[in-house]
From Swiss-Prot:
Organism in which the protein naturally occurs: Danio rerio
Biased composition (Basic and acidic residues): 112-173
Lumenal topological domain: 1-2
Comment, domains: The UFM1-interacting motif (UFIM) specifically recognizes and binds ufmylated RPL26/uL24, resulting in stable association between the 60S ribosome and the UREL complex.
GO CC annotations on file: endoplasmic reticulum; endoplasmic reticulum membrane
Cysteine pairs bridged by disulfides in the record: none
Primary location class: endoplasmic reticulum
Protein name: DDRGK domain-containing protein 1
Subcellular location: Endoplasmic reticulum membrane
Free-text function comment from the UniProt entry: Component of the UFM1 ribosome E3 ligase (UREL) complex, a multiprotein complex that catalyzes ufmylation of endoplasmic reticulum-docked proteins. The UREL complex plays a key role in ribosome recycling by mediating mono-ufmylation of the RPL26/uL24 subunit of the 60S ribosome following ribosome dissociation: ufmylation weakens the junction between post-termination 60S subunits and SEC61 translocons, promoting release and recycling of the large ribosomal subunit from the endoplasmic reticulum membrane.
InterPro entries: DDRGK_dom-contain, DDRGK_domain-containing, WH-like_DNA-bd_sf, WH_DNA-bd_sf
Length: 300
């Protein structure tokens, strides 16, 4: 399509050049003819006669000559004017044809250029949109990775802390158990008697069984049962809780409540299922989940 346009433009340009040369030749011929006519008129014009006082007839002949010359000049001009008018008309037509042809070619190219620019702008907009979506996705991925890394570090930290606490508790329980086993003392009438290892172990088991069967025991009664001071009984309970021999709590009324591991698991499962619970709800659930009825009522 572009080759056809180029050939058409070259043909139009060639016609314009030939037309311009033709007009120029006609103009030069007309100039030569005008020059010859003027020269002929000048040479044919009579010379002015010397003024005379009574020379009226001679002046009238000169006047007639000038009038005739002017008439001949006008006739010559009228003969030349149709040719010049035709040439001017042809020049105007050629000039009008050139902008029209050039305008058609230019409008088509302009339309193609605008369509090309529109497609390019659309592609750029789509590319920018894809890049924006990709950037947002990368940001979301980075945020998710940060959250996952933060959670992983927190879990690792909690596991390390639990492991440290567990190891520390096991070490302390072992130390307390050895100390309790080796130095279990019964105070009788203000005198301390050190027991053998077998007796100490037997008395320790009796102490544990008494608490487990009683379920709820006053600390003063527990101390009196084994001939201990109340503070010593509390210390023994704390040591046994620390090494895992007993599980339970000491309330603010001076009682120890024994809770089995199964009951503790039941309470933990209740809290896990309910999520957030109040103290009153937990106390109400504990009455059904924890058995507080003693197995025996005896004193040593």
């Amino acid at each position: 399509m572009d080759v056809v346009l180029y050939i058409a433009a070259a043909a139009i340009l060639l016609v314009l050049i030939v037309f311009s040369v033709k007009i120029r030749g006609r103009t030069q011929d007309a100039d030569v003819e005008d020059h010859q006519n003027v020269t002929a008129r000048v040479s044919a014009r009579p010379q002015a006669a010397p003024e005379r006082a009574a020379g009226m007839p001679r002046r009238r002949r000169g006047l007639h000559s000038r009038v005739n010359a002017q008439r001949a000049q006008r006739a010559s001009d009228n003969e030349d004017s149709p040719v010049e008018a035709d040439e001017d008309e042809e020049g105007r037509n050629a000039s009008e044809e050139r902008p029209q042809a050039a305008g058609k070619v230019g409008a088509k190219k302009q339309r193609k250029l605008e369509e090309k620019q529109a497609r390019k702008a659309q592609r750029e907009a789509e590319q920018e949109e894809r890049e924006e979506r990709k950037r947002l996705q990368e940001l979301r991925d980075q945020e998710r990775q940060k959250e996952e890394e933060k959670e992983r570090q927190q879990e690792q930290k909690q596991e390390e802390e639990l492991q440290r606490v567990k190891e520390e508790q096991e070490r302390r329980e072992e130390e307390e158990y050895q100390r309790l086993k080796e130095s279990f003392i019964i105070e009788d009438q203000g005198e301390a008697e050190e027991l053998t290892e077998h007796e100490s172990q037997s008395l320790l088991q009796e102490f544990i069984q008494y608490v487990q069967k009683s379920k709820v025991v006053l600390l003063e009664d527990l101390a009196s049962q084994f001939g201990l001071r109340t503070q010593d009984a509390i210390a023994r309970l704390q040591d046994l809780i620390a090494d895992g021999s007993l599980t339970g709590v000491i309330d603010d009324r001076g009682k120890f409540i024994f809770i089995t591991p199964e009951e503790l698991n039941a309470v933990a499962q209740f809290i896990k299922q309910r999520g957030r619970v109040s103290i009153s709800e937990l106390a109400q659930a504990s009455n059904t989940l924890i058995n507080l009825t003693p197995d025996i009522h005896s004193s040593a």
